[in-house]
Amino acid sequence: MLRYFFIIFFIPSIVFAEIENARDLMEAGKFQEAMEELMPAARSGNADAEELIGIMYAMGLGVEQDDVRAFEWYLRSSMKGHPGAQSGVGWYYEIGRGLPAPDLVRAYM
């Protein structure tokens, strides 16, 4: 029973701390370190981490700017209901960056 208590209450706070640490690193301009903090959380399905990685690829922060990868990370996060990522996906559909062509129908859905 105590084991479940630990899993339910402490594991999410550890992940939240990793995301906040990554944001602090991004604000300090340490993008490579931020990516190293974010990648494990994103691979385990954390929508905030996925959205931040999308931002890094979209803006070329610590990685080579890549609209296709940015769109993929935004899309993963948006499928989990992340509002910032949903906005990013809509923008990519509207402008058509990272896609074969703009898709205004999907952009405004």
Language-model features, listed with the residues they occupy:
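N-terminal signal peptide c-region/cleavage motif recognized by signal peptidases
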Residues: P12-A17
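Short helix-capping/linker turns of helical repeat alpha-solenoids
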Residues: R43-A47, M59-L61, D66, M79-P83, ...
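Hydrophobic face of amphipathic alpha-helices that form TPR/SEL1-like repeat modules
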Residues: I19-L25, A41, L52-M59, V63, ...
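TPR/TPR-like (Sel1-like) alpha-helical repeat modules
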Residues: P102-M109
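Sec-dependent signal peptide recognition
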Residues: M1-I8
